[in-house]
């Protein structure tokens, strides 16, 4: 089953650009279509592969950035 996931990463500090750029770089290493806009990043792919890969990227981001919010919409 194909899905689209819209992600918005919100680091809760003044230096927010670096964590966002690192998050997007990690998403680009996945074997999925990545589309960016000023507010969010959308990824498209097969549900099982996308969600298992995305889980690791999210975990790394939370470990590297102690104060961060991630908004995720699955369509």
Task: Briefly describe each language-model feature range.
Residues 1-75:
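Charge-rich, low-complexity N-terminal segments
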């Amino acid at each position: 089953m194909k899905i689209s996931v819209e992600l918005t990463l919100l680091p809760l500090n003044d230096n927010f650009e670096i964590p966002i750029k690192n998050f997007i770089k990690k998403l680009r290493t996945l074997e999925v279509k990545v589309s960016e806009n000023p507010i969010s990043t959308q990824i498209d792919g097969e549900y099982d592969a996308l969600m298992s890969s995305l889980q690791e990227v999210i975990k790394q981001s939370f470990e590297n950035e102690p104060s961060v919010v991630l908004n995720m919409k699955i369509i």
